[in-house]
Amino acid sequence: MYIDTEVMIAENMLPYINSEGLHIYDRNHGFSQFVFTGVEEDIIKAVNSYHDLHEVWSQVSTKYGVGDSKKAKISFFKYVEKLYDNHIIDYGGIDRVIMGKPDRIYPLFCSIELTNVCNFTCSHCYKEAGPSCEEYISLESIRKIADNLKNHLYSIDLTGGEATIHPEFTEIVKMLDGPKLHLLTNGSRLADLDNEILKRFEIIQVSLYGKSVEEYLKFAQNIGFKKVCDGIKRVTDMKIPLVIAINLREDIIDDIESYIEICRSLGVKSVRFGIPLKSGRNDGVITDWDISPDKMKEFVDKNRILREKYNDIDIQEFNKADIRRKKRITKNRATIVCGAGKTDICVSEKGLVRPCVMLPENYFGGITIEEYISKVEMNTGIDYTDVICETISKLRDRGKTIDSFCESAFA
């Protein structure tokens, strides 16, 4: 790179700081995270302040007392080159806002389960949501999030149950305006929402459970397939970014191209795939949502072929890490190794905070939103060690391991 040109933290990077140091997230690659040593952190902060590499070197070399050491200077510019090669820095002179606070651990991403009520009764639902459920998050809990956390959040996901069923959904959306808002929905009520509310969402994600009324009746106990399609078409016609999420079954893999064709006919520009959690209604039993290793390999091949065939729709590459069989956690202790519980939190309809939507509330949801906010303000954090140990013990009695919730969260 040219050392006499202005440099800045790259536009696609999201810088965030907390009491544990500087973190940078790559928004173009699934928010993959970069962490840094103290010296590296000081270099990046200086880049963000001065934008001139000679001045950055001057500031860092003075702080660490290396003077004009030739060896140190060579190491400095090699590291700057590495930052550039990894697209962490780029040419430019813009100061980037660094989110968070250096003396706190504020969350950066928050999922809010507005309700456990749903007009579908999906056979794989991790929350066991359905029409017979009756809990809704209170406006008081939403107000606490808005007053104490909202200004520190990069994004908020509204989910459920079916989030749009909440009787105060419109007011909640308005209260949480500020961070990037994402709606995760079954799509059946999108056609009925006000344009003003829909336009407040940066992204709307619709889960697609089948390609016909019959399949919706079988897997979601609802005949609302046409209603879902109408909602999707309305959103794409409004030019609101929309992604279709397809949880895989073996019958879906057999006919995956038909799903892509349906999405294209509705104006969808992005499709992603996932595997349902083995919890809730999908816990502990062999179901239609279980996929053999051979079938999964078949899907990975089909996914590649479809991405090559269709250039008018972003068919997201399936993350092979999702299907890789990792070494199982069999010890009595484990730790959370991702951002869950720190940069990521989930708030349930009960107003309880847990580290992530993928970690069930009956194991991890033991702290109220009020208690959580208090711990953030006092920078005491939440120690999940005992919870994890208890969960490992309970799951072992059922012949399961803790990484059955998420294969990448624990070590």
What are the roles of these predicted feature ranges?
Residues 2, 200-203, 207-209, 214-341, ...:
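Radical SAM enzyme [4Fe-4S]-AdoMet core and its adjacent flexible, acidic
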Residues 1-48:
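Acidic, low-complexity/disordered tracts enriched in E/D and polar residues
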